[in-house]
Amino acid sequence: MTSVRDFPKIKAIRSFIIGGVGSGGDYHNVKGGHWLIDSDISTPASKWDQYKKSRTSWGINVLGSFLVEIEATDGTVGFATGFGGPPACWLVHEHFERFLIGADPRNTNLLFEQMYRASMFYGRKGLPIAIISVIDLALWDLLGKVRNEPVYRLIGGATKERLDFYCTGPEPTAAKSMGFWGAKVPLPFCPDDGHEGLRKNVEFLRKHRESVGPDFPIMVDCYMSLNVTYTIELVKACLDLNINWWEECLSPDDTDGFALIKRAHPTVKFTTGEHEYSRYGFRKLVEGRNLDIIQPDVMWLGGLTELLKVAALAAAYDIPVVPHASGPYSYHFQISQPNTPFQEYLANSPDGRSVLPVFGDLFTDEPIPTNGFLTTADLDKPGFGLTINPAARHKLIPSDYLFKMPQVGSLPPPNPSEESEETSKPNGTLDSLAAKVESLTTSTTS
């Protein structure tokens, strides 16, 4: 009889930069003209005129996508995608790989803690923990495949048979016609646009309310671009529009500000969390009781392992969790939890008026909502149920082709006479790397 301790160990870690546009975990790595980057959308950079027209002008898509593969000793491979591009791949191998090789992939809590604590001196939030998130998701995908179970069955099983979606996009009428539960629209103007901008925001939302009728849920995404005074005034001006919730009105770090806007409008729903990280960050949001919903992104906050802790914390305060985007990675979480009433679908078509896979053409079998919902049967495949599209394989640039650098600890003492012509030039190594990425990326889009 096989011992319960006989379980495949982690044998190898591989990472890939995803070349081109329109594939992988960076939602904003799309072609020009896409509503998500080139619509009128208020952002933290909208206060400067040169950064208003397109979100790419201030670099929202600068990192790009990457993919991590984790291979077990029995040959099983789990994988996941996220945002981070070349810097993410570098950290996967130069820092985080040491905690993974030879480890038991079932020890997701231990592996998260080791990676999180070891990167605390430069991480905790942002890109480092987003990289940990993708590694964690690849571990869960591996576990599901080894056990021949969908991930949601590994984390408690189904609490519902159907996942209802709302759609984030430019046209609520399109979301309604496609069968979605509700629609979320990005706010077009910021406080620096003055009273005229505020008036235009109200007119914009009134137009959409009239287009879908009085009862179809409309949510507003403010994308961290407002301040307390402006938010209070805008919400007051829109009280008759029956806005379901106001999302990310303030900087993620302005927890006191959320208390002030909730005090000003106690019966209005406010949400945030898309740009928060780890259970420690969400503890502040939950314990303040100034938010009606939290919206973690499983590809950013620390992965599924950390999201489960955040969900338990929120449940103790009776606060619903509505995950931000993340495609199937969120779907398995959402269907397993009792305090997750619905899920976001981020419209991935250029005009936002049709339903396409969240991760573009990277996978052949990504489940997408039909008539605004999915069922548990749509998720009943091992792991996260995804298969890398053979036609997209050429976009996966192995990171070991780009990063052939010795470990820092093994570098010999400097010897100027042995420096190559390339590396002795200013930024020679970085320039060479950039040229390789550019040439490979260009070749995938031609």
Segment roles from a protein language model:
Residues 58-62:
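Short loop/turn motifs at secondary-structure junctions and domain boundaries
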Residues 66-72, 367-369:
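Short beta-strand elements
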